[in-house]
């Protein structure tokens, strides 16, 4: 048995794995923020034409929210329905591309599981993580389907107005 003062190699490896997962989700969040800022910059360009999103779809004006420099601030509520749908599609594409990263994490966990010298608790934790990752359907998760249907409902609501 390991003494309480010593760290095992598997504990350090799981810490590194946790760091990799945290960095992955941080990058996903950063991508969403950068995309939103890019859409803001694109819609409040230098000319005084109609505000236009990154996908070339005109945005509705929101005169109550002006920036100090005179440009307009874009919010998801001021977007057209088509723009909202395309924005959701871009986010879902990023989520689907993340599947490769999950597969890499799963392979790494399987490698650590077969290593000698790791405790039973660590092995059971790895088993739990592997079962969680393997329980996800191969094509598209239910959460993504729910979000897509929600995006369609929001888009239909905008089309009625």
UniProtKB/Swiss-Prot annotation:
Q: Which residues cross the membrane?
A: 16-36
Q: Where in the cell is it found?
A: Membrane
Question: Per UniProt, which keywords does this protein have?
Answer: Membrane, Transmembrane, Transmembrane helix
Of the GO CC terms on this record, one is: membrane
Q: How does it sit in the membrane?
A: Single-pass membrane protein
State the source organism's domain of life: Eukaryota
Q: What is this protein called in UniProt?
A: Uncharacterized membrane protein ECU01_0910
Q: Which organism is it from?
A: Encephalitozoon cuniculi (strain GB-M1) (Microsporidian parasite)
């Amino acid at each position: 048995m390991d003494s309480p003062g010593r760290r095992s190699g598997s504990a350090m490896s799981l810490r590194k794995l946790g760091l990799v997962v945290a960095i992955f989700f941080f990058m996903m969040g950063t991508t969403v923020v950068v995309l939103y800022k890019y859409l803001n910059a694109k819609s409040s360009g230098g000319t005084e034409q109609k505000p236009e999103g990154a996908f070339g779809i005109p945005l509705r004006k929101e005169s109550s929210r002006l920036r100090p420099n005179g440009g307009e601030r874009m919010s998801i509520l001021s977007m057209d329905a088509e723009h909202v749908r395309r924005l959701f599609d871009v986010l879902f594409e990023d989520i689907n591309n993340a599947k490769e990263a999950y597969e890499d994490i799963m392979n790494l966990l399987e490698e650590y599981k077969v290593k000698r010298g790791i405790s039973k608790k660590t092995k059971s934790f790895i088993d739990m993580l592997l079962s969680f990752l393997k329980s996800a359907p191969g094509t598209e998760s239910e959460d993504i389907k729910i979000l897509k249907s929600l995006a369609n409902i929001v888009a239909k609501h905008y089309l009625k107005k």
